[in-house]
Amino acid sequence: MKNKKVLFFILLCVGAFVQAQETVRPFEEFFVEGMKKIDGVFPVYVADGEVYLEIPSEYIGREMQISAQIDRGFDLLCRPANGLGVVRITSPIEGTVCFQQPFYMERILDTESVYQQAFSLSNVQPEGISHSVVSYSGERGAIIRITEYLLNGDEWFSYQYSFIRSLVPALSEVVRIHPFDEGVSFTVKRYHGVEAERYMYSSSAIVLPDGSMPLEVTCVLRLLPQKKDRIRLADNRIPYRTLHFKDYSQDPYCMVAVSYTHLTLP
């Protein structure tokens, strides 16, 4: 029975691998005439309203922060949005890139511990948000389609206000792409349904005939620096914070409860 389960798992993985391979196009076919490339830490490709992000091969295994804010719209100005946060970029199989958020309640602090391999096998983390690779660049960078995540999705970022109604997907558009030293940002104009009566006397709001208003949102992808025993805080200006987890590298017979207090000065 156990052998049958193992065989089924292998066949499932092989099927996923073959399916991923079939969807990957040669770069010459992907980079069509009229496509625009924006260089940077994460190169971006734009063509016919579609947006693609390249993940260089050397960044697989690195961590990235996905954050967002509402720039303007609905009488809101520079309001923070709920971002996905810190993710680890992984590629569990060829043709797939995942944004993983590992569960850190158990760790091995000693990176050279003999238990590292056994721990990684027994403490398998969920893959997270999966993205199919559409092509590989000449430098073997994985290129993924991110149009839906920016224009209509709520997996990367979201916001909730009682006066912001449902999204009108057909009107969404990317209005600005800005590469910077640590990553890239996307400014997106989304249109949402609105209560027209709420903005009858607002001088800053223009309600469209179909009952929708624009909302500008900026989503930022930032590559985080490599750091031994990475413990990421939401804001590095926080003077202290205590984290609790269990370490398996201090005692070969049992786990040890650890409390870390971040005392870095702002």
Regions found by a protein language model. Name each.
Residues L11-Q19:
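Hydrophobic h-region of N-terminal signal peptides that target proteins for export
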Residues M1-L7:
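Bacterial N-terminal signal peptides that target proteins for export
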Residues K5, A16, L76-C78:
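Short, intrinsically disordered/low-complexity patches at protein termini
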Residues E22-L263:
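Auxiliary tRNA-acceptor-end handling modules of aminoacyl-tRNA synthetases
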